[in-house]
From Swiss-Prot:
Residues 929-1067 form the MGS-like domain. Mn(2+) 1 binds at Q284, E298. This is Carbamoyl phosphate synthase large chain. The lineage of its organism: Bacteria, Bacillati, Bacillota, Bacilli, Bacillales. The keyword Translocase does not apply.
């Protein structure tokens, strides 16, 4: 059946901001789907709130709305656009929940909008825990013994009957939000309550724990004619009990017998048919390793994180084909775009092993609870491909950018036996490395299996790596031995450490013995059909399938896994750069290792290498391809950090030179450049030890801002107010050395200003100036950015332009630069980044300028004048746009939600309107804030903020909010004639701050941080409780000011009429 002719216009719902559990995989899926529908001649309307996506570029759909993904906004777009159909299954859980809500409100029926692909009844059957369980019973498929409850009271009976542990799974949530495994009565009560709050239908499934069984996932596709195939079967390294997003995953399945596989394949096809899903679907199983007993854990009736992994692992573009299936195509009518000869109805076959390892943010959040369970905590992931499991695994490990390229984590050597075994039994993000440490200490595979429940097969593979390491150390190095360990995935850096050699000596020896990788093609069919796909992975075999073409090429380095501080914004810039290189007639090559992103879609570049971003792996690709040069500007700090080693090996870095990159990143060279240009900067110094740091701070005067050099996302950055804090920071937060000095600046409070600019070496063009609502001291990535700026005079804006032009020329920028200023009576330069920044997508969207594209054109030699730009600033927009950060604190237990100089947000949203208040309202709503127009405001304010907070409290009071405060703050408010409900401090008897938050009596918390130890502890507990209860908690008074502006703009003023006057005489 060809595409449906009765549909002309389709609305596609995106997934919104990046949060833990829903990341860049939906940008990849949504972009694929929109382009596929446009390819078929449909008019495509897109709504999404995330500006940092290729999906929201004006070229992806016919019309793009960057608006909050809330029913009232999407309803308005539907009534305005009148689409014939809605495609919601590519927008993750957000898209499904929106479709469900729009249907419930009658919007789809009233406007005659058909839901494409998977029908609502199937979504409800898969997402509603009770209906799903009943369907599995009907089909005769096992589900763990379970019960659905809507209240805590009704949950106790199940707990008493079954006993602990119990798994709690909320309905209609993302990444296991609100769920977990309860091991006792106390944790059961806490998780059930949080699960009921997290579920939009107040429903949780209580399930007898099957933790310890094998976890297997099947990615399935089906069309309207009931053709169904398995795209990919994947197996988790970790047994059931760890969320699949936090688990290491291998494809194809490694330990299933043919009988196991065929059984689960049949069950998967049975389930997708019973649900009537048209498109992609992910099914998760628990399999008893000692019998043929299986349980169906859950079904995701949509494109998911696993779909993106399966697409990249197999080369089969699930989202693209799912979109075409949704408009009526059969799988047997669709050509597989990889082979261009076989059809989409052929199940992919793999002749390699794929390993996925999650990337966590615990390097930024050392206080976080690192234990893994059913609630996802990873911010991103890496994927690697090898000819064997060991090679794929070790390539994935070095893709994580953890500062190591092997399984030996040195700090684990300090664990005693009890600590080690605790780490084996209770999984954390370091589980893989802890298992390897146990093998190093002589634990047997069988003992480790009993402690971890990890399949013996995987433990044997890890043991093989350990044995190979031992042989390498103990026996003379021969070409045969070196080839053996290279085939197992050992890197030159790891081999050099094991042999106490220099890395370059290992590389030289390898070349001498002609031990070089070749590149194999990912073709979906294990070479059964001819394939032209330019999608490669490196391995140590004989035949090279990545034969260099005659065309001149340019290599772009990607940004690796998504983490806090380096998100999807960098992939956005990378994709634009690749497009520009292709349009200029060059062959565009990319190296990246993130399966979630658009840049690793094989159709984006001319040649894609799915490889680790290390010096060794990048140099090998360069030797295979011999490009004209390498662009490092768009890959964040990952790519910038490779520039020096690449140039040392004779590689040409295109754009800003390495020397100039270093001048911007090296403190002394940076200060010298600013002094030469007579540009002001906050007074600052560098220190390499505690004594130097104390002397520097005394000279500068407290408070000071301290941070390590060469970091992204403000990692380990703090504002310190006294010597004892500084000494603690120097001893515990950083490892300072002559090579890695600590930067110490006078801390200036003022308006923070941010600029992205493009320079061709002669001219400097500024797309726009952004101001931050939060004053300097809150990381720019966690601040609300406003464009065009609302508080800057024309004179100050001109000064920003003049400074930007001077800086771009002084640092000899070729391409992009990002500058951060602070205005505090004068304009100070905080930092200059000679690369793409996280604001590039936002400034591109609000100005209509494709910033990364223009920057790439200048890198390739086109002048700004030739592009019709020259020197100056782009005309300001009439409308006002805001970029609002989005946080994932509910998923990261023990992380303090207070804002400061270290970045904590995982994503962002954008909103545009005619006034700042309207734009802010939309932005705050899109970021998930519940804006109350009445209710209770709890204020706990540090002494140094009290004067400013009182003025804000008066405005809340005038708006009719009820104020709540502890004694110190309450005294201040009452002294200003405000009514206050007093609540006790945490340690006091009676009604306390925590009890009113836990009871749901508070609509907004304003909590500013104090340096008093007891107050600090109380503040942390308040902020954490607020995060877990879903109560809005603001820690910056600037954000409170912005919120008040919004509430005041939404509130009607009630004013009594004045008395009559007659000719100036009162009547």
């Amino acid at each position: 059946m060809p595409k449906r002719p009765d549909i002309q216009k389709i609305l596609v719902i995106g997934s919104g901001p990046i949060v833990i559990g829903q990341a860049a995989e939906f940008d990849y899926a949504g972009t694929q789907a929109c382009l596929a529908l446009k390819e078929e001649g449909y008019e495509v309307i897109l709504v999404n709130s995330n500006p940092a996506t290729i999906m929201t570029d004006p070229t992806t759909a016919d019309r793009v709305y960057i608006e909050p993904l809330e029913p009232e906004f999407v309803e308005r777009i539907i009534r305005q656009e009148r689409p014939d159909a809605l495609l919601a299954t590519l927008g993750g859980q957000t898209g499904l929940n929106l479709a469900f809500e729009l249907d419930k409100r009658g919007v789809l029926r009233d406007c005659g909008v058909e839901l494409l692909g998977t029908k609502l009844s199937a979504i409800v059957q898969a997402e509603d825990r009770e209906q799903f369980r009943n369907l599995m019973f009907e089909l005769g498929h096992g589900v763990p013994e379970s019960e659905i409850v809507h209240t805590l009271e009704s949950a106790w009976g199940f707990a008493e009957r079954i006993g602990y542990p119990i798994i709690i799974r909320p309905a209609y949530t993302l990444g296991g939000t609100g769920g977990g495994i309860a091991h006792d009565r106390e944790s059961f009560e806490q998780i059930v309550e949080s699960g009921l709050k997290a579920s939009p239908v107040t429903q949780v499934l209580l399930e007898k724990s099957i933790a310890g069984m094998k976890e297997v996932e099947f990615e399935v596709m089906r069309d309207s004619s009931d053709q169904a195939i398995i795209v990919c079967a994947m197996e988790n390294f970790d047994p059931v009990g760890v969320h699949t997003g936090d688990s290491i995953v291998f494809a194809p399945t490694q330990t299933l017998s043919d009988r196991d596989y065929q059984m689960l394949r049949s069950v998967s096809l049975d389930i997708i048919r019973a649900l009537g899903i048209e498109g992609g679907c992910n099914i998760q199983f628990a399999l008893d390793p000692d019998s043929f007993t299986y349980y169906v854990i859950e079904v995701n009736p949509r494109v998911s994180r696993s779909s993106a992994l399966a697409s990249k692992a197999t080369g089969y573009p699930i989202a693209k084909l799912a979109a075409k299936v949704a408009v009526g195509y059969k799988l047997s009518e669709l050509k597989n775009p990889v082979t261009e000869t076989s059809y989409a109805s052929f199940e992919p076959a793999l002749d390699y092993v794929v390993a996925k390892i999650p990337r966590f943010a615990f390097d930024k959040f050392e206080s976080a609870d690192r234990r893994l369970g059913t609630q996802m905590k990873a911010t991103g992931e890496v994927m690697a491909i090898g000819r064997n499991l060991e090679e794929a695994l070790l390539k994935a490990v070095r893709s994580l950018e953890l500062g190591m390229e092997e399984l030996h984590l040195p700090q684990l050597s300090a664990l005693d036996t009890e600590q080690l075994e605790h780490g084996l039994i209770h999984p954390t993000d370091e589980r893989l490395f802890i298992v390897y440490e146990a093998l190093r200490r002589g634990y047997s595979v069988e003992t480790l299996h009993q402690l971890t429940k990890i399949d013996r097969f995987y433990l044997q593979k890890l043991n093989r790596i350990w044995q190979a390491e031992q042989q390498l150390i103990k026996e003379p190095l021969t070409s045969e031995r070196l080839l053996e360990v290279k085939r197992l995935g050992f890197s030159d850096v790891a081999i050099a450490r094991m042999l106490s050699m220099d890395t370059e000596a290992v590389r030289t020896k390898r070349k001498e013995w002609n031990i070089r990788p070749v590149y194999k093609m990912v073709d979906t069919c294990a070479a059964e059909f001819a394939s032209e796909t330019p999608y490669f992975y490196g391995t140590y075999e004989v035949e090279n399938e990545a034969v260099k073409t005659d065309r001149e090429s340019i290599l772009v380095l990607g940004s690796g896994p998504i983490r806090i501080g380096q998100g999807v914004e960098f992939d956005y810039a990378t994709v634009h750069s690749i497009d520009t290189i292709r349009d200029a007639g060059y062959e565009a090559i990319i190296i990246n290792n993130n399966p979630e992103t658009v840049s690793t879609d094989f159709s984006i570049s001319d040649r894609l290498y799915f490889e680790p971003l290390t010096t060794e792996d990048v140099l090998e690709v360069i030797e295979n391809e011999n490009p004209l040069g390498v662009i490092v500007q768009f890959g964040g700090q990952t790519a910038i950090n490779l520039a020096a080693s690449l140039e040392a090996n004779g590689v040409k870095i295109l754009g800003t030179t390495l020397e100039d990159i270093d001048r911007a990143e090296d403190r002394k060279a940076f200060e010298a450049t600013l002094s030469a240009e007579r540009l002001a900067q906050p007074p600052g110094k560098t220190a390499t030890n505690v004594e130097e740091a104390v002397a520097c701070a005394n000279e500068l005067g407290y408070p000071v801002l301290v941070r390590p050099s060469y970091v992204l996302g403000g990692r380990a950055m703090e504002i310190v107010y006294e010597q004892s804090e500084l000494e603690r920071y120097m001893r515990h937060a950083v490892i300072a050395s002559k090579d890695r000095p600590v930067l110490i600046d006078r801390y200036l409070t003022g308006i923070e200003i941010e600029v992205d600019a493009i320079c061709d070496g002669t001219d400097v063009y500024i797309p726009g100036i952004m101001e931050h609502i939060e004053r300097a001291g809150v990381h720019s990535g966690d601040s609300i950015a406003v464009y065009p700026p609302q508080r800057l005079s024309e004179e100050l804006k001109q000064k920003v332009v003049d400074y930007t032009i001077k800086l771009a020329k002084a640092f000899r920028i070729k391409g992009l630069l990002n500058i951060q200023f602070v205005y505090a009576d004068d304009l100070y330069v905080i930092e200059v980044n000679p690369r793409a920044s996280r604001t590039v997508p936002f400034i591109s969207k609000v100005t209509g300028l494709p910033v990364a594209r223009i920057a790439t054109q200048t890198i390739l030699g086109t002048s700004l004048k030739e592009l019709g730009l020259g020197t100056g600033i782009h005309p300001e927009s009439d409308s006002i746009s805001v970029k609002v950060p989005v946080f994932s604190f509910a998923k990261l237990k023990e992380v303090d939600p207070s804002l400061g100089p270290e970045m904590k947000s995982t994503g962002e949203v954008m909103a545009t309107d005619r006034t700042l208040e309207k734009a802010l309202y939309k932005g705050l709503v899109a970021a998930g804030m519940n804006i109350a127009l009445k209710g209770n405001v709890l204020m706990t304010i540090a002494d140094h903020d009290k004067d400013e907070a009182i003025a804000l409290a008066k405005r809340f009071d005038r708006l009719g909010f009820r104020l709540m405060a502890t004694s110190g703050t309450a005294d201040c408010l009452e002294a200003e004639q405000m009514r206050v409900r007093r609540v006790g401090k945490i340690q006091e008897d009676g009604e306390t701050m925590l009890s009113v938050i836990e009871r749901g009596d508070v609509d907004l918390i304003i909590n500013t941080t104090s340096r008093d130890a007891l107050v600090t502890k109380d503040g942390f507990l308040i902020r954490r409780t607020a995060a877990e209860q879903g109560t809005l908690c603001l820690t910056s008074l600037d954000t409170v000011e912005a919120l008040l502006q919004v509430i005041e703009s939404l509130s009607f003023q009630t004013v009594s009429i004045p008395a009559f006057t007659t000719f100036g005489v009162m009547v």
